[in-house]
Amino acid sequence: MLPKKYDPNEIEPKWQKYWLEEKIYKYRLDENKPSYAIDTPPPFTSGTLHLGHVLSHTWIDIIARYKRMRGYNVLFPQGFDNHGLPTELKVEKEFGITKDQPEEFLKKCVEWTWQAIEAMRKQFIRIGYSADWDLEYHTMDDWYKAAVQKSLLEFYKKGLIYREEHPVYWCPKCRTSLAKAEVGYVEEEGYLYYIKLPLADGSGYIPIATTRPELMPACVAVFVHPDDERYKHLVGKKVKLPIYEREVPILADEDVDPNFGTGAVYNCTYGDEQDIVWQKRYNLPVIIAINEDGTMNENAGPYAGLKVEEARKKIAEDLEKMGLLYKKEKIKHRVLRHTERSSCMAPIELLPKKQWFIRVKDFTDEIVKVAKEINWYPEDMFLRLKDWAESMDWDWVISRQRVFGTPFPFWVCKNGHIIPAREEDLPVDPRFDKPPVEKCPVCGAEIEPVTDVLDCWVDSSITPLIITRWHEAIKGDEEAKKWFEHNFPTALRPQGTDIIRTWAFYTIFRTFKLTGKKPWKDIVINGMVAGPDGRKMSKSYGNVVAPDEVIPKYGADALRLWTALAPPGEDHPFKWETVDYNFRFLQKVWNIYRFAERHIKDFDYEKYKDIELEPLDRWILSRLHRIIKFATEELERYRFNLITRELMTFIWHEVADDYIEMVKYRLYGDDEESKLKAKVALYELLYNVMLLLAPFVPHITEEIYHAMFKDKIGEKSVHLLSWPEYREDRIDEKAEKLGELARKVVSEMRKYKNSHGMPLNAKLEHVAIYALESYDDLKLIEKDIAGTMNIEKLEIFKGEPQLEERIVEVKPNYKRIGPRYGKLVPRIVEHLKNNAESIAREIKENGKVEFEIDGEKVELTKEDVMIKKEVFSEGERVETAVVDDIVILFF
């Protein structure tokens, strides 16, 4: 029996424990069942889930539960992305160990990561996440690192991996190179500096504009637009850089924007991506003025050792003293920052470094073509990937100057030759392991280990191969081969908008290059979570809400409904009032089933399910099956928000407020046949509503199932039952019309009772309904209206009622007449009382009435009085309500 009170903190942990103990979600390879493999996102092991995780992973869980109910064999593992700078920083801070002790440092990284995994797994379980935890994977596992290294060896064989010096995105704060996908432009306030550069021949100056005067020591050219009349005569000349007394050429290039600043810019190696393009296009020298730590180097001359920001300020001051800085304009401009890690956000420098690359730029057309074969939800998210692919300036930098990461499976010699690891030795760590050979097989030189580690996206970009056991299948493992063939390409990749250009892009590329196939059939994209104030959640805004703040108060199911209301591809604000509403909805659901339990728990539905039902039963079941059809179609499109709103509205209003209220008189009445039909409809309705809700709110539906249905059905979980079957024969448009009519009429009668302070079950002695077009339909539901509203005498007539409106009282507006007539007011009141009808008529006709009291003229307008009217039918006073063509008379 369902307890009186809905308490999610009581029921939710109980069922989470039950699901784990009974292995309800255990995946077993079954080649006779259709496969549905989900390439779940492995969150970085920060130690705690945020609401973004809750949103994305609840979506995934809804899909998994739905697909199981549709008969699919759902492969639903969950992994954790372990490597990365935040863990290294945490270990340095927590344990006081530096990277100079690599083995001890790595040991502590692994130790801390395991603690984070344990905490996050508990949080996943607490939101009702139905992964098969026996398939959990971690990117720091040896077998996982071996698979990543195997994929790199395959790329090396294909000629896709190389090492060279190239300008890379460099984070001075993190002291490592970054991929383009890890950086982004942030709009900020800054200054545009206008500087006069002297011409080398002494004939004058050329004015340039720059946001970075500190890069002057790295200037290698000045550029103008070839059609700019202001500077055409200067092309080919040289300028002499102030402070450094070095000459650089003035060149013309169409990439210059003549409308920016002065229309002339200097080319420094390297201020931005455009500087790289010009340096390569014109084979200009490379001068580096910035160190890895973000300080100026010896090429900066008198500014060496200063931080970039300090050097910018000092060189601007010196140029101003020299009379060469003639304007400093405050502007908003875009600054390149380390955006992937909100804990960093440092400005990025472009520094030439010896780095490892995967060739990807040559394959962007191929990647876009493969991506187009995937079904994108929403469709326009494909364009984000396409735009990203087409904007790439150089290949994927995969090396990171860190410690905790998957090692490269390579050694190098001093002549630059690459020595790959033997496959049978994987995983290897060149920092600690012996190389496969003593000398370089190409030139005989000494061999050195590659001490860099891999970009974490190299790890996570093979997740669809990891979960389908590609790494075992290619070794000849027969079971793994079957597993891979049955599950790859995977059915679904769920992920956020923020990692389309990283996880989605790199996974499509890497998987296709390794298998010749797309990684998934569908990809569904969720937006980001905003704070209650609509802004991005941030500690600096003070608008961060943690899942652990929400669940103890409202439970996981109420929070899950909040996630389900998020539109695909759009940002979704967290609103406390939404979760509160969801909780009240679940209380309503609880009360519906508590009411129904006594009527249908022991009812033999199978015996009576084909009985001819009454109009309102047919109405609610017709509406139910329309909802089933809609929910099924929209779940296939991953539009949870549309289903959730429709389902909540249907349950709260049509089921709880209307049908159940209109069926109570039958369930408690003496008409056994009518009671039987009501039970058939109520059972079919609530059994299927439970199934429709199950993927969204798994805990409350499991509680309901065990309390009301399990004894008859036998299956050990609601989540092992079949999805509701849409029945075309249940669609009844005539019954739906009758149901809507009953709702409207009953609603008006409820309003009448409320306005008179009557309980909803209070008796109405006499009600008459008049209608024209609706007359025949009203006669069909006459019994339901009378029974629902407890009407002693209900009459339904065809036609319009004969009504008489009478003036029964005219009252004065004391605030208006008091100041005007003072002592006469009591006499005026008496006059109004005795002549109410004639006074009201005259005011209606003339807008005013005039009369005398004790010889003094009194004039009243419609604003001075309140006219009370009453309606009579056949001499008896009535109150009326009108809905459509229907007039309701309350006697």
Curated annotation (Swiss-Prot):
Family affiliation: Belongs to the class-I aminoacyl-tRNA synthetase family. ValS type 2 subfamily.
Record motif 'KMSKS' region, residues: 536-540
Annotated organism of origin: Pyrococcus abyssi (strain GE5 / Orsay)
Subcellular location: Cytoplasm
Sequence positions that bind ATP: 539
Sorted UniProt keywords: Aminoacyl-tRNA synthetase, ATP-binding, Cytoplasm, Ligase, Nucleotide-binding, Protein biosynthesis
One BP annotation, GO: valyl-tRNA aminoacylation
GO cellular component: cytosol
Entry-linked SUPFAM superfamilies: Anticodon-binding domain of a subclass of class I aminoacyl-tRNA synthetases, Nucleotidylyl transferase, ValRS/IleRS/LeuRS editing domain
Substrates-to-products reaction catalysed: tRNA(Val) + L-valine + ATP = L-valyl-tRNA(Val) + AMP + diphosphate
PROSITE patterns: AA_TRNA_LIGASE_I
Molecular function terms from GO: aminoacyl-tRNA deacylase activity; ATP binding; valine-tRNA ligase activity
Protein name (Swiss-Prot/TrEMBL): Valine--tRNA ligase
Domain notes: ValRS has two distinct active sites: one for aminoacylation and one for editing. The misactivated threonine is translocated from the active site to the editing site.
Job of this protein: Catalyzes the attachment of valine to tRNA(Val). As ValRS can inadvertently accommodate and process structurally similar amino acids such as threonine, to avoid such errors, it has a 'posttransfer' editing activity that hydrolyzes mischarged Thr-tRNA(Val) in a tRNA-dependent manner.
Assigned EC number: 6.1.1.9
Locus of motif 'HIGH' region: 43-53
Pfam families with a match to the protein in the record: Anticodon_1, DUF5915, tRNA-synt_1
Class of this enzyme: ligase
